[in-house]
Curated annotation (Swiss-Prot):
Short name of one Pfam family: Iron_traffic
Alphabetic keyword roster: Iron, Stress response
Gene designation per UniProt: yggX
SUBUNIT field: Monomer.
Gene3D superfamilies to which the protein is assigned, alphabetical: Fe(II) trafficking protein YggX
InterPro entries recorded: Fe_traffick_prot_YggX (IPR007457), Fe_traffick_prot_YggX_sf (IPR036766)
GO cellular component: cytosol
Record function comment: Could be a mediator in iron transactions between iron acquisition and iron-requiring processes, such as synthesis and/or repair of Fe-S clusters in biosynthetic enzymes. Necessary to maintain high levels of aconitase under oxidative stress.
The protein's name in its UniProt record: Probable Fe(2+)-trafficking protein
GO MF, one annotated term: iron ion binding
Species the sequence originates in: Escherichia coli (strain K12)
Protein's GO biological process: cellular response to oxidative stress
Length: 91
């Protein structure tokens, strides 16, 4: 049975995560406040960001950058800037 949460990102009730996807306090916050739909949107942005900036997840600085972008996107409403990318709705 799925659980319903109020998603901070979507600003509406939505299906919550099945389990904590990220470690620590930030992971608890994501589990409690971010829906599956919002997390999928972040994963799409994350993949683009890793590829375009050629981030290496073995590098602690790159992981820190990605975590900050995640917080900005999910909790602060900031768009992820990916150089050279124009969203479909803005073309």
């Amino acid at each position: 049975m799925s659980r319903t949460i109020f998603c901070t990102f979507l600003q509406r009730e939505a299906e919550g995560q099945d389990f904590q996807l990220y470690p620590g306090e930030l992971g608890k916050r994501i589990y409690n406040e971010i829906s599956k739909e919002a997390w999928a949107q972040w994963q799409h942005k994350q993949t683009m960001l890793i590829n375009e900036k050629k981030l290496n997840m073995m590098n602690a600085e790159h992981r820190k950058l990605l975590e900050q972008e995640m917080v900005n996107f999910l909790f602060e409403g900031k768009e992820v800037h990916i150089e050279g990318y124009t969203p479909e709705d803005k073309k």
